[in-house]
């Protein structure tokens, strides 16, 4: 089995799931991180998305602080109204993110498994990179394995799983942690089968 552990941070309002950032960690050590460029886009769509994010207290407290932040002299030259460093190379148009995510998953191999923690929304967010669920590109799995579901199958609760040291709601840090937990669960399952 080859696996890609991933996590999305997104704005969800009961109707839409709009991506903010994605982190992916492959079994071979490769990593991917990107921030939806719509958060930095000029024009009506970008302004509207930023406005909706700004009004979402939980996102502002838990997700936005983990997006790329200005450093060095940049801190003195960026408008205070900016949510994060819009000029960071991780900030990309969603179409480019879709291409890079597809390439990342395909590079993992033909039998790739996707894993996420509470992964239902993550998979919908992933699938919507290419439109409808049936429009998934070849090589991108039609489903994501869920860490919480596997933990419950093994009789484990939240307190039985390793805790994340830091970076909670940084999509890449979450993907790395997902890999740690998934490896533990897969190892336990292999022990059960023996």
Regions found by a protein language model. Name each.
Residues 138-159:
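Short, flexible loop segments at boundaries between secondary-structure elements
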Residues 93-101, 122-125, 143-146:
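Amphipathic alpha-helical interface surfaces
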Residues 102, 131, 152-155:
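Amphipathic alpha-helical core segments of compact helical bundles
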Residues 110-120, 124-128, 158-194:
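Acidic, Mg2+-coordinating catalytic module of metal-dependent nucleases/exonucleases
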Residues 2-4, 9-116:
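Conserved non-catalytic scaffold segment of RNase H-like nuclease domains
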Residues 105, 120-141:
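Substrate-recognition/cap helix-loop segment adjacent to the acidic, metal-dependent catalytic center
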């Amino acid at each position: 089995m080859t696996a890609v552990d991933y996590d999305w941070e997104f704005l969800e309002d009961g109707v839409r799931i709009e991506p903010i950032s994605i982190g992916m960690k492959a079994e071979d050590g490769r990593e991917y991180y990107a921030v939806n460029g719509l958060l930095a886009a000029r024009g009506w769509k970008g302004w509207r998305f930023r406005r909706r994010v700004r009004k979402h207290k939980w996102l502002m407290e838990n997700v936005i602080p983990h997006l790329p932040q200005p450093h060095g002299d940049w801190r003195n030259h960026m408008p205070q109204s900016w949510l994060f460093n819009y000029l960071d190379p991780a900030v990309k148009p969603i179409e480019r993110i879709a291409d890079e995510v597809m390439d990342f998953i395909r590079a993992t191999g033909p039998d790739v498994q996707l894993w996420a923690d509470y992964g239902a929304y993550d998979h919908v967010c992933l699938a919507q990179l290419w439109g409808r669920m049936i429009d998934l590109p070849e090589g991108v799995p039609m489903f994501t394995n869920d860490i919480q579901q596997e933990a419950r199958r093994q009789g484990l609760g939240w307190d039985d799983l390793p805790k994340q040291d830091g970076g909670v709601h940084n999509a890449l840090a979450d993907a790395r942690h997902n890999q740690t937990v998934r490896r533990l669960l897969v190892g336990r399952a292999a022990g059960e089968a023996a």
